[in-house]
Amino acid sequence: MDPKPINEGMLLEDHDHGMPEEEEITEDDMNGIHNIEEDTRTISEIAMELHHPNKSQVLLDQERFLPIANVVRIMKTQMDPQAKLAKDAKECAQECVSEFISFIASEAAEICNITKRKTITADDLLTAMEATGFDNYAEPMRIFLQKYRQAHKITGPIHRTHPDYVRPPQFQMDPFVRPLFFDTEQGRRCTETQYVINGSEIVKNAPLGEEWNEQTGTLNTRADGYYMEEPMEPMPMEEVEIEEHEEIIEQDSLGAIALEQQGQMQIYVDPKTKQHFAAKETPNGMELYPLIIQDTPLQLENVSGPNQFVMNMPDGRAIPHGMGQEEPQPVSSSSVMRKIGQNPSSYAQQHHHVSHVEQHDDVEYEEEEEVDQVEEDTVPVPIAPRPAATRVQPKRTPTKRKK
C-alpha cells in the first residue's frame, strides 16, 4: 500500500495543533505589570529544569554549550601558535566547561534558595565548589576573589565556609585566607563586610571603616552589641573548650604569668608541634599564649615577702616564683669524666641517662662515688725491672795464614 501523501497544509495543521492560543497584550503588560499567577518554583528547581530538560523538549547545542569558537580561542592562548586542535578535543572541552558551569550554578542556586536570597554572588559559587568536592580549587579562587575586589575597590559579603568543606592536605599548613583592605575617599575599607543585602546593597551609614581590625584580620566588637567579633583562625589548630577561663593579672621579670580563673576559655592546639595556646581577648584583638602541660599538677601558694608565689613540686621541694636566689650551676658530664679518667663513650654505656632534675641533685654524690671507685681499682702493681739487653758478638773463624 502506498503511503498517503503529506502536503504542506497538513504539516501546518499538525504543527499548530496543541499550541496555546495567543494571549491579548494589555496596557498593563506594556508597562511591565503582568497579570499572571506568581511562580511558586524555587531558583534551584528552575536551574535543575534548565540543566536536565525533559526528553520531549528539544534543546539546541547553542543553548546547552558555550560557543565553541570562544572555547577554542581560550585553549589556543596556552598553546603553540603552530599547534592545531582536533575536532573531538574542541567538543570535549566545550562540553566539560559547559557542564561544570551548569553544575556549580545549580548548587549555588540551591544555597540561595536555602538562605532565601535571589542574587547569586561570587561567594555563593565558592561555597558551591566547597560543597561539591572541588576543594583544590575553592581556596585559590577565594584568594583571587580577594585580590580582584581589592584591585577594583569592591566590598562583598563575608565568606561562609560550607560545613562539609575540609581543607586539602597541601593547604593544611598554610594560614587561612584573610580579607584585604584598600583606601577610599571615605577611609580604609575591607573587601568583606557584613552590611551587605542580596550581594549588592550596603546598609546606609554603616561603620565600614571601624568594622575590621586590619592587624589581626578580625571583626571589631562594639559595646552596644550591634555586631560581634568573628576572629579568623591564625593557624590550623584544634579548638578545645574548658570550663575555666584564665585571665592574666600579673607578669614577673622572667615571663611567668599569674592567671585568674573566670568562666570559659578557648585553647588552641597545634597539630604539628602539639603546643597548646590560650586565647586572650585584648584591645588589639585575640592573642595566643603558649601553655606548658605537665604530668603532675603544681600547687601555687601566696606567701609574704618579695616572692609573691611559691610552687610546690611533686618531690617536696618549694621553688619561689620570683626566683630571687641564685640558681646552682650544673656540673657538666665532661668535667666529671676528666676527673675519672674514662672515655665519654664508655661512660655513657655503663650509666643510664638521668633527667635534668636528678642531675642537679645527685651529680655531686655520683662524682664522689666514681672517684672513690676509680681510686680503689687503680692500685699500683709492682713490676719487675727488665734486664738490660746484652749484645752478643758473632764468632769469627780464624783466617788461614798465607805461606
UniProtKB/Swiss-Prot annotation:
Tissue note: Expressed in certain parts of the gonads with high expression in fertilized oocytes in the uterus and mature oocytes from the distal to the proximal arm of the gonad, but weak expression in the syncytial ovaries and immature oocytes at the beginning of the proximal arm of the gonad. Expressed in secretory cells in the pharyngeal terminal bulb wall, in the small ganglia surrounding the pharynx and in the neurons running anteriorly to the sensory organs in the head. Not expressed in the intestine, the hypodermis or body wall muscle surrounding the pseudocoelomic space.
GO cellular component, one term: perikaryon
Self-association and partners: Forms two NF-Y heterotrimeric transcription factor complexes: the nfya-1-NF-Y complex is composed of nfya-1, nfyb-1 and nfyc-1, and the nfya-2-NF-Y complex is composed of nfya-2, nfyb-1 and nfyc-1. Interacts with nfyc-1; the interaction is direct and is required for the interaction with either nfya-1 or nfya-2, and subsequent binding of the complex to the 5'-CCAAT-3' box motif in DNA.
Pfam entry (one): CBFD_NFYB_HMF
Biased composition (Acidic residues): 363-378
Repeat found in the keyword field: no
One GO term (biological process): tissue development
Keyword Repressor belongs to the record: yes
Family to which the UniProt record says this protein belongs: Belongs to the NFYB/HAP3 subunit family.
Role of this protein: Component of sequence-specific heterotrimeric transcription factor (nfya-1-NF-Y and nfya-2-NF-Y) complexes which specifically recognize a 5'-CCAAT-3' box motif found in the promoters of its target genes to regulate their expression and control cellular identity in particular tissue types. In association with the components in the NF-Y complexes, represses the expression of the T-box transcription factor tbx-2 throughout larval development, which most likely restricts its expression to certain tissues.
Basic residues bias spans: 393-403
Compositionally skewed regions (Polar residues) per UniProt: 330-348
Region ranges (Disordered): 318-403
UniProt KW keywords: Cytoplasm, DNA-binding, Nucleus, Repressor, Transcription, Transcription regulation
Protein name: Nuclear transcription factor Y subunit nfyb-1
Single Gene Ontology MF annotation: DNA binding
InterPro entries linked: CBFA_NFYB_domain (IPR003958), Histone-fold (IPR009072), Transc_fact_NFYB/HAP3 (IPR027113)
Disruption phenotype: RNAi-mediated knockdown results in ectopic expression of the homeobox protein egl-5 in the head region. RNAi-mediated knockdown results in ectopic expression of tbx-2 in the gut and seam cells of L4 stage larvae and adults. RNAi-mediated knockdown enhances the larval lethality phenotype of the tbx-2 bx59 mutant.
Subcellular location: Nucleus; Cytoplasm; Perikaryon
CDD domains with a match to the protein in the record: HFD_NFYB
